[in-house]
Amino acid sequence: MSCLLNNMVLMGLALLVCGVQAFFLPNTTSLEKLLSKYQHAEPHSRVRRAIPMSDRQEILMLHNKLRGQVYPPASNMEHMTWDEELERSAAAWAHRCLWEHGPAGLLRSIGQNLAVHWGRYRSPGFHVQSWYDEVKDYTYPYPHECTPRCRERCSGPMCTHYTQMVWATTNKIGCAVHTCRNMNVWGDTWENAVYLVCNYSPKGNWIGEAPYKHGRPCSECPSSYGGGCLNNLCHRAEKPHKHKPEVDMMNEVESPPAPEETHVWVQPRVIKTKKTPVINFMTQVVHCDTKMKDSCKGSTCNRYQCPAGCLSNKAKVFGSLFYESSSSICRAAIHYGVIDDRGGLVDVTRNGMVPFFVKSQKNGMESLSKYKPSSSFTVSKVTETAVDCHATVAQLCPFEKPATHCPRIQCPARCGEEPSYWAPVYGTNIYADTSSICKAAVHAGVIVDEVGGYADVMPVDKKKSYVGSLRNGVQSESLNTPQNGNAFRIFAVRQ
């Protein structure tokens, strides 16, 4: 076997590609024998898993999600499951803290992806997404281009992380995370390096072959799947079984006695009890007599939903262009012509102190004068704009002081599936304004990816940094010390 070494890539990603003269795939028994070398035979001793359950679920979910959305579509892409034997073999290698692939005897029958980082916390999903993002440099070899061997078509430093992830016949994965006190990475010593090892079976990246067959999803699944298809993946329906109650021992596996190790993350993660997510709305629902000074007590006091019938209400309005803060919001909006007696949406901008306010007759109502300095506000009409998955706040309505109003955004379905190099998302809760608006809305839980929908956007001043996370099937990215641009918050719309 000859080994092809590729160039180094950012964030410490590496994959070993092994070519063979014959296509060798061991049967289950052979693979178990190989894996058994990296385990002890003594039963009934327990140590904690090599990877937290939350990380395991994140890795597996993201692999299957990304495998199901390859382009061109795959006709034989198999659903991945977690394999504890592969997890244990990955843990054995991760504990050695060697920045290379191994052990050599196991690499003949498994695939392997590696990643390492130090400094602030990055979830395993961040690295999985980075592996997949090599797709931007990969050109899929169609059947007519393989005569009979397919030529490697990678225009970047490396594509083999991506191809192993989407190798159709690879249907098992097991990963481990280990914190290495000192790890030699390309000649430098990294302290407290967080090392991720993912092992795959059956292995992929066979030289001269395409990673999957192109065609209608699930149209060429192996017969063992019985025609099952789930999210564009060949899927075997599981037999119903009784679930055991979740206890602490469920997160443990049979293994030989060993010193118990506590994973030391550079930024410790606190796992909290899941709560029902709180849905935040930017638009406040108000009454005809709601005053600006009474309603505006937080940051989201710039969009209001007014009811019908405010024209005949007796609430006072002071001023004409600039309205005094004790004025009725909805009646000021009618006076200025932003809405009529049927009600509707109003955007409000606070404008600071004004020396006096002058009355006027407009749109069927009369405002009053007030010759006393007071804080003021203006009103404006809310528009709606349909955008695509790539639209950003930086393009549409970038932040300007004192405030910027964006139209109500209508997002199409499935923006969450857009690749990060076309539709990036930076941050959590507050996003960089170069992020995809609609993909950020999916990440924030504001809209459902399968159907799309409406969202309200609030441009805000830039942050010093943005922290990535995996939410609602979307992996956002981290961004430190951005040179340009501002930020935004995104909110659900009441239906």
UniProtKB/Swiss-Prot annotation:
One of the protein's GO biological processes: face morphogenesis
Domain SCP span(s) in chain numbering? 60-200
Mention one GO molecular function: heparin binding
Describe the location of the LCCL domain by residue ranges: 282-377, 383-486
Sugar attachment sites are N27
Disulphide bridges in this chain?
Answer: C288-C306, C310-C330, C389-C411, C415-C438
- According to UniProt, the name of this protein is Cysteine-rich secretory protein LCCL domain-containing 2
Q: What is the lineage of its organism?
A: Eukaryota, Metazoa, Chordata, Craniata, Vertebrata
Instruction: Provide the gene name from the record.
Output: Crispld2
